[in-house]
Amino acid sequence: MKITKIEKKKRLYLVEIDKKESLYVTEDTIVKYMLTKEKALSKDQLEDIKNFAQFSHGKNLALYFISFKQRTEKEVRDYLFKHEINPHIIPQIIDNLKKDHWIDDYKLLESLAQQNLNSGDKGAYALKQKWLQKGCEKQVIDEVLTQFDFSEVAIKVTSKLLRKYQGKLPTKSLKDKLIQNLINKGFSFQESKNAINQLELEADEENEQALLYKEIEKQYQKFSKKYDGYELKQHLTQSLFRKGYDFDAIASALREYF
């Protein structure tokens, strides 16, 4: 068999064999196998050309994908599969890219962890879950995260949350709110407690009393439609306690209110 036609098509070349079979190859394939019109090919040579063309095309696609930003190994695999690169060729492409340091999950995660340390707002658990979803190996993730201490990030996030909620909640509810928000962002319970302790929250008794009376009025409007007397006081007490107000402060305020 021989090549009867070679035609450039954007990034690829169309190679026609015996005016019957055709395939698309990269420029690297043309150069590597010195493909020219009328060149004779054996069956084995043609198979080698097809495999290398897939490899070369897949690698070019991967490099294009990586050029926009760093990618995990799984992201590159999925991208190649999506673009219909032969599944048997994909591992070769990945190995080649890793050998040339185009793909390096460890360094990528190190970079992302450092970014989070400098300007992010996530704890280690949130980062780990995100990276696992990206297909990174648990062992690699754990090795990277052991290098970083995100306690300062937790303090920064706590300070920001404090500006949002302080003065709007009693101290106990405020602390609970802060801890829940921090846990949701991937910090451990202990990291969350330590961050709050670092900021040394102080109760504003005058403000808390004002909040309590305001809440009593609100809850009274709700429960007085169904209850009165002792039952009303019980429901008010339970509701206010669940909202983080001190039991003694509730009892004192209700005595004044009634």
From Swiss-Prot:
Disulfide bonds: none annotated. GO terms for biological process: regulation of DNA repair. Gene3D superfamilies: Winged helix-like DNA-binding domain superfamily/Winged helix DNA-binding domain. The keyword Cytoplasm applies. It comes from the Bacteria. InterPro entries: RecX_HTH_1st, RecX_HTH_3rd, Regulatory_RecX, WH-like_DNA-bd_sf. It is found in: Cytoplasm. GO terms for cellular component: cytoplasm. Pfam families: RecX_HTH1, RecX_HTH3. Keywords: Cytoplasm. Modulates RecA activity. Belongs to the RecX family. This is Regulatory protein RecX. The gene is recX.
